[in-house]
């Protein structure tokens, strides 16, 4: 199985900040990389698929980039509603494995 690693398990930022969350695959996944958002209430939403394609209805402050084994999710102008845990997922092979998640919190 392909292993997905998110080395930062939690991240603290201020409202309005630009935040970048990283993800690494154990082998080349040819841009088959998705990002999911899990809100504190458990709601899960697909944000980005195929590295950089924004899912319908997702605000443009979210963006994705990367290639090969290294990928990132960037949130520009952080808003309160962005407080959540973010997971990367590879879609190249089955099983479609996930990273361990990065919990984003507001710096007070």
From Swiss-Prot:
Keyword Chaperone belongs to the record: no
Record GO biological process: adaptive immune response; immune response
Complementarity-determining-3: annotated segments: 89-97
Region named Complementarity-determining-1: 24-34
InterPro entries given in the database record: Ig-like_dom, Ig-like_dom_sf, Ig-like_fold, Ig_sub, Ig_V-set, IgV_Light_Chain
Keyword match Disulfide bond: yes
Framework-1: region residues: 1-23
Disulphide bond pairs: 23-88
Miscellaneous comment as given in the Swiss-Prot or TrEMBL entry: Anti-arsonate hybridoma protein.
PANTHER family referenced in this protein's UniProt entry, alphabetically: IMMUNOGLOBULIN LIGHT CHAIN
GO cellular component, one term: immunoglobulin complex
Organism: Mus musculus
Region (Framework-3): 57-88
Pfam families cross-referenced by the UniProt entry: V-set (PF07686)
Framework-4, as annotated region: 98-108
Protein name as annotated: Ig kappa chain V-V region HP 124E1
Region (Framework-2): 35-49
UniProt keywords, alphabetically: Adaptive immunity, Disulfide bond, Immunity, Immunoglobulin
Region (Complementarity-determining-2): 50-56
